[in-house]
């Protein structure tokens, strides 16, 4: 199977921008969140399981899942979050594996927001962690989700702590300056992963 790098980091750390930069360099990127959205779209098995568990209050008028409502539930109740993760993670892992088989770039990048245990993804050779200063994260969450700073802090509080993240990480990318510096760091890592992928072959 192709050499693969797991890209992770807390919410609003700049993961998506980093993934875009790798994509511009010709690297295939797999998005776990996108897979999760497809797996929970209307009338899928996971969709039915979620409604059976949470009830009709998580369904919008058009029949789609009310993702904001579900997010509010799991951010305020760790047991509900664990239930949802146990439902989705095994099927997400399987879908990622299927996409890795058809990867055409020298290595593949997999964006997995909640990756803090590499053993759950045995096909990963490396884990790249993106870190951003707390204030930057808060600003991004407030702007993106149109929420208060207090709500943004509550969202961040549900994320794995930095120690857990660092324990799983092989490489750490600190996103604290402008885009040009971030791009330069990505280019450097790209060269490193190209070399490592070549050795693996």
Curated annotation (Swiss-Prot):
GO terms for biological process: coenzyme A biosynthetic process. It comes from the Bacteria. The keyword Metal-binding does not apply. Keywords: ATP-binding, Coenzyme A biosynthesis, Cytoplasm, Kinase, Nucleotide-binding, Transferase. SUPFAM superfamilies: P-loop containing nucleoside triphosphate hydrolases (SSF52540). It is an enzyme of class 2 (transferase). It catalyses: 3'-dephospho-CoA + ATP = ADP + CoA + H(+). One of its GO terms (molecular function) is ATP binding. Residues 4-201 form the DPCK domain. Pathway: Cofactor biosynthesis; coenzyme A biosynthesis; CoA from (R)-pantothenate: step 5/5. Catalyzes the phosphorylation of the 3'-hydroxyl group of dephosphocoenzyme A to form coenzyme A. This is Dephospho-CoA kinase. The gene is coaE.
């Amino acid at each position: 199977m192709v050499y693969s790098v797991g890209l992770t980091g807390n919410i609003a750390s700049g993961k998506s921008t980093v993934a875009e930069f790798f994509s511009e360099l010709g690297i295939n990127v797999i998005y776990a969140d996108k897979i999760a959205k497809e797996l929970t779209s209307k009338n899928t098995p996971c969709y039915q399981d979620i409604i059976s568990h949470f009830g009709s209050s998580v369904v919008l008028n058009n029949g789609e899942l009310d993702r904001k409502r579900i997010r509010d539930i799991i951010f305020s109740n760790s047991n509900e979050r664990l239930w949802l993760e146990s439902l989705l993670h095994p099927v997400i892992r399987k879908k990622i594996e299927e996409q890795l088989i058809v990867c055409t770039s020298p290595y593949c990048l997999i964006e997995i927001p909640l990756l803090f245990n590499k053993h759950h993804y045995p096909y990963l050779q490396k884990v790249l962690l993106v870190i951003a200063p707390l204030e930057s994260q808060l600003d991004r969450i407030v702007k993106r989700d149109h929420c208060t700073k207090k709500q943004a802090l509550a969202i961040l509080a549900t994320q794995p702590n930095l120690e857990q993240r660092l324990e799983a990480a092989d490489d750490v990318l600190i996103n604290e300056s402008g885009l040009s510096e971030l791009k330069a760091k990505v280019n450097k890592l790209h060269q490193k992963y190209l070399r490592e992928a070549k050795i693996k072959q």
